[in-house]
């Protein structure tokens, strides 16, 4: 779930480095012979790698633990509503997703968020209060909305105004988002801006998240300008001077009319006949010698180097690969790679994850005293509620909800309530409905419901994440043919994952097969 732009992530280094090129620029004429490629993980990262490999003339095999492709991207149609089980959109500012969608022939299916209706509320003291207009994450850029908001106290407003006077300051090392924002704007800005916003995006706590990894743009602005507000305003002025189109701004978010599942289906259709997909749950490594044959389906139990290549164990048998892309969660990669590089496996195992839950509640619009206002609301931890956030789907995107229906997507879990995933669907639905009624002020009962659980699916970029990545990259540099992709490294969004899969494919297409 994303309500606001968090800025462009830092370019990765070494094997995790993001390509600065906006599209695949390599000569895709296939080398002869092509390397044998195995991709572990059939989410958007692994599928993107497979798509660009197939585009370059290479075949590969995807090993996916779930019975379907797409990972956390999953779309359902219920009573005319388009329901996203996971992410519902992607940031327009990051181009990789739109580039892939264009290549898949889905450009006419792209829709933008209804930004003229984009109001995000924050619950405080039992009331829903809109975020001040002009807020860029936690950075105020307009004085009047800041002065008139009921979300912040006068002492915090004064402090945020005086932040304009801050001088540049050298910041050695990494620190938490909470420390960084509190130094600039005070503790209340952490509690009612940073915490609810980052809980909605990362499912994590600002006291644990790395500011260097999560808000790299703000770190750069603080280093250059001292004041975040002054830095954001200066960047906006530069952008306006370069933009001579005079047209309306791009929508903050984009998606597909029929849901993001359209993209997964289109990739699967595009690679059919070129990419083999095998299903089975990834498990622990079992070192063994060279083995022959492979069952059609079974759990991928581990990988180990085989000379200069890799052997991947599935259901007691082994398959070989010259190039291996590990595009599953880092904790799964840790188990799989223990026989390849123990230190790399240990590092991957230190990437924390949080769990999340999406609850879709469909209501009769006639049961509401008034139509829902804005994109939705955020619930800070201080409010002591189980709901983390809620999106009014029909307001955020057109074509998603038929007339006469109100669809709410509620979010629970994260680091503040990991135990929620252990509760029954009935208990979760009762709690989510009751809190939604209380917070939004209505008594309607849902006409239909859906519950989606995502255990250990949201990577946490905790303090020290840049140092961890540097060591991961150092280990990767000593293992030719091994690539990592996914949301555990240099960006959690759909465009970030697509970019990493594409870059892995670019590297593999440049490598001939081993003789």
Protein language model regions, located:
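Active-site/ligand-binding neighborhood in enzyme catalytic cores
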Residues: 116-119, 139-143, 156-284, 302, ...
